[in-house]
Amino acid sequence: MAQEILVLGAGMVGTCTALELRLRGHSVTLLDRRAPGQETSYGNAGVIQREAVEPYAMPRDWAALLAVALKRGLDVNYHLSGLLAAWPQLLRYWRASAPARHRLIGRQYAGLIAHCTSEHERLMELAGAQDLLRRDGLRLIYRSERALDAALAHAGRLTQEHGIRFAALDGRALAAAEPAFRLPLAGAVHWLESCNVSDPGELVERYAALFRQRGGRLLLGDANSLRPAGAGWQAESREGPVQAQQVVLALGPWAGDFARRLGYRWPLFVKRGYHRHYRGGATLNTTTLDAERGYVLAPQRRGLRITSGAEIARLDAPPTPRQLLGAETEARQLLELGEAVEAQPWLGSRPCSADMKPLIGAAPRHPGLWINCGHGHQGFTLGPASARLLADLIEGGTPYTEAEAFAPLRFGR
């Protein structure tokens, strides 16, 4: 039975949710303060990470934690104010990263990740967006033999447990695959089933265009205006009030504050990240993670995009692009980088949950309120797959993959 549904948030997750529901015949309005794909979804590395069957765990060894505390590497940075504000969530993150618990979380997470590529491909075909997709995998490069050996052992375990494919490259094979690299490297793990998108923001725009073509409404407005109205909900747009029977909260890094106003204390926190494009340098054939340095090099339409590691900071804290500047220094040693396109780095935020799994399902105390947020590093990857899962739940049918593990109710009422 068709319903009136309002989706708050036009990033990858929200746009895919609105599109999936509209494709199923529901009357759907997508509301955001900006055009689709202009916030978090614009700024990632553009990788659909089929290999990400286990979410990123917090380091458990004290040497790694000390390196983070002393800011010795580029993979993690923090503001003290942000660290203190997120301390309860980070403690829960630490506990969830214990090996046995993380292995269980990984098995649950893998059930959703398994559909990430096929679900994107389904929507890309409908949206005519195949020109943005490259099926060339994700390459993780290593500078030391010790790190490479550990990575190969880890990749072998993931292949055995989840069936995902990879290729092992020694230093000579890596040099042949990427002639632009001018440093001797130990080798690489090349995940073969991951895909790359040459313009992440453009892909969200294509999905939004398909949503409109199929009869969906896209409006500019303030999600904070949402309030109960009769048997449903109402929010304010620039064109006037919008009413719906059901509402989906897909506000990315802003979801935690919004949920707290409704009385929910879900353990959500923010990891910020930076990027910048470079042109006029060497050609890189495949998106590459410099694994021992903590940054990504992604060939994209605007140039070679460098994306930074994670920064624990308040959502509205001033930019501190230490990681990106350090990544640029490392990248210039690795290959001819060219000149920066933007005068200042881009800054965005990832919405993370303490147990590393997204929240997908019904809000426990508010009938008609649905949640699709907290995807961490994988909102871009999981947008279509989590949209399909939530649509199954809204319609009351049998979910196409496990749903209970992602229910907001796991954090209590």
How would you label these PLM feature ranges?
Residues 23-43:
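Glycine-rich FAD pyrophosphate-binding loop
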Residues 87-209:
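Rossmann-like flavin
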Residues 169-177, 219-233:
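A conserved short coil-to-beta-strand element within the FAD-binding core of flavoproteins
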Residues 162, 200, 292, 336-413:
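C-terminal catalytic lobe of FAD-dependent flavoproteins
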Residues 47, 52, 56-95, 225-228, ...:
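Active-site substrate-recognition segment that forms the wall
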Residues 3-30:
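N-terminal Rossmann-like FAD-binding beta1-loop-alpha1 element of flavoenzymes
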